[in-house]
Amino acid sequence: MVKVTLVTAQWCHYCPTAKKVWRDLKDKFNFEYEEIDYESPEGEKLADKFSIVSVPTTIIDDQIVFVGVPDKDKASKTLEKPV
């Protein structure tokens, strides 16, 4: 199963829009989804592992796929094909 991880921050003005994109797609596609706060211990580990310097950042199956708010159509196409 595809795993989508969205790295966000409370102070991020674009993160609510990115969350909405992935939550809406969750209703259409079958994938595992989690939201991780950039400033949490888990978020800090992901930031180190993937050299994340900007939020929102979307990681799909252990690869950064989107930095910033993903376009819903592009995100849909990403979920339709293997990453």
Question: What are these language model-derived features?
Answer:
Residues 13, 41-42, 73:
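Short alpha-helical
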Residues 48-59:
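Structural micro-motif
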Residues 31-44:
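Thiol-based oxidoreductase modules, predominantly thioredoxin-like and allied folds used
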Residues 60-83:
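Non-catalytic, surface beta->alpha helical segment in thiol-disulfide oxidoreductase systems
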Residues 16-20, 45-49, 70:
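Generic recognition of short, well-ordered alpha-helical segments
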Residues 1-27:
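Local sequence-structure signature of Cys/Sec-based thiol-disulfide redox active-site neighborhoods
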